[in-house]
Amino acid sequence: MPTHSDLPNGDAAVFQDNSFHGEDTYITRELNRRIAIDAVFDGATGRGGGDASGYAAKTLQEATVDSTAGVTALLEMAHQRLFQRGRGRFFLTTATVTLKIGSMLHVVNIGDSPVFLIRGHDIMPLTGTAQGATFLGIA
């Protein structure tokens, strides 16, 4: 059953239905009055995807970040640890992260999950979608 969560940083919501695979993880976190981070991780492969999405989310949940460079560095660290743990296989996840700093919203997107900006009745794609075969972490 989908769950709904109002985010602390404005008019936003997350809808999540993990009844099929349970490999998705999301976080919503207000670091201070100016900075908030929201992220969705979609675990892939059906084998270690849930572990990967959970680990990536925990990494961001426990850290203090104030820039997209900080988000990118944390995700790179999580990637290296998961890659070593799985020897290049199985522990895979996408990451879609928004970092609100003041009135600016920054997006970091890794993988094939599309990102859309919705304002009123306008829907604008911020990223494309993957087309064709995608080869994930096979060493």
Residue ranges of predicted features:
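PP2C/PPM-type serine/threonine phosphatase catalytic domain
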Residues: 1-139
